[in-house]
């Protein structure tokens, strides 16, 4: 058995879904442990794309059970729509393979409206997806949240809605002056959705615990990336949950269960959606080339992703924050056949050179130390025996600076275009 965590090691959009989908072939459970439908995973199988936002990437494997842990904030409208959309394409989803924690905090219409009006009424944009993620986590922490199980009980749901709406009603009416659903309108919608989705409600804590005790393979699938972690990330330009490995313990299982592998999913370059510092960002034709070739458009937001060279000081920081055991490098093919190829190995900052970022650093004030790398070309299926020499040098540069090995290499969009240097699953 193996307990494997997939963590985004950058600002999200690293290709976690692709790696999770590939590992799910040998997994018994694939578990989402934080975030919400602000995540967007793209899977490509036989040339066909599947887009996921809430449901774990194991859904394409019939034997794999998918779990949404209690650390996820759940939009029941989005979950219902995603299930319906996937079922329409022939993907089997039922109470036999999808288990949603009864303790997930629910995202309501009020959370989404509050998210939108806040972003539109501030001069300092965060770049929120507008999905209501932050306000839902606020209610969770302030003990005003609505849990998934509350949707099934009329009296409890109405009571929890009244608590949640009380403060927001004043904001909507007096501060933002926007229309909002009445309590009864929201109640009717949520209760109806609760009846429809109740079949998926489960004690996921025990499901995961029992699977581990039975020696099953469990893959924990993170959303976003370490650099968006509410504690470790580039605050305030972060998400509202713990996207690092810490989120596994707070959002799915207990610290009593050890983790065999913590894989940091990393693009061969760097991207970011929304606002915030980005030391290696490219504003020239090279950046536009990477953007176009890499198809760098957000699955959830439809926004163009900012692109830049691979940032090793930030990657090393992510590795430390999540105790990464290895790196899964993705989108290597995007850098193939480039005229110019660079990587950031350090920063000049406040009169000194540093080679690993840290929480208090002001990334707006760093000057990246860029080194020129020899361009490489990928024109065929990549095996351990035919990796181009220049690519080997690129990989070794990453390993030497970050201090952990690269355990897999993705060089195309399909699940077949991954070269594994390590078997994550224990034998026997």
Swiss-Prot record:
Swiss-Prot/TrEMBL catalytic activity: IMP + L-aspartate + GTP = N(6)-(1,2-dicarboxyethyl)-AMP + GDP + phosphate + 2 H(+)
Gene Ontology CC entries for this record: cytoplasm
Details of cofactor binding: Binds 1 Mg(2+) ion per subunit.
Binding site for Mg(2+): 13, 40
Enzyme active site: 13 (proton acceptor), 41 (proton donor)
Function: Plays an important role in the de novo pathway of purine nucleotide biosynthesis. Catalyzes the first committed step in the biosynthesis of AMP from IMP.
Protein name (record): Adenylosuccinate synthetase
